[in-house]
């Protein structure tokens, strides 16, 4: 199934704006929220085709929320790409073990992210 709807979960207004502009310009329908809690509320109304997940956020972090999504029958098939400044190999491995399909580090390179999205869809 091609990816059309993307949910961005990132507490940085700058990152949300950059990702929203980039993805909208490439024809994706984008919703951007600033916390895992806000994302959980958003998922009750409509399911995206992909989630871009920051790790370091107030409240529930991105690793925890990705794990929660991967265990829920309603959301377990939605691919998650971790999109974060946490760039250690141990962070990447931990993110993948929590259920993420891929992992990119900030500052995000547009072509790399678009390539990863294309590979999932």
Feature map (PLM): residue ranges:
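Active-site beta3 strand of CheY-like receiver
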Residues: 46-52
């Amino acid at each position: 199934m091609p990816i059309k709807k993307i949910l961005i979960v990132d507490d940085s207004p700058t990152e949300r704006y950059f990702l929203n502009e980039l993805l909208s310009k490439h024809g994706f329908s984008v919703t951007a929220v600033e916390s895992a809690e806000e994302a959980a509320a958003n998922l009750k109304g409509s399911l995206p085709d992909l989630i871009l997940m920051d790790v370091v956020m107030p409240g529930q972090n991105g690793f925890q929320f990705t794990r929660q999504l991967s265990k829920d029958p309603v959301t377990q098939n939605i691919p998650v790409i971790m999109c974060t400044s946490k760039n250690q190999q141990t962070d990447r491995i931990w993110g993948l073990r929590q259920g993420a399909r891929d992992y990119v580090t900030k500052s995000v390179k547009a072509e790399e992210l678009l390539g990863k999205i294309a590979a999932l869809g």
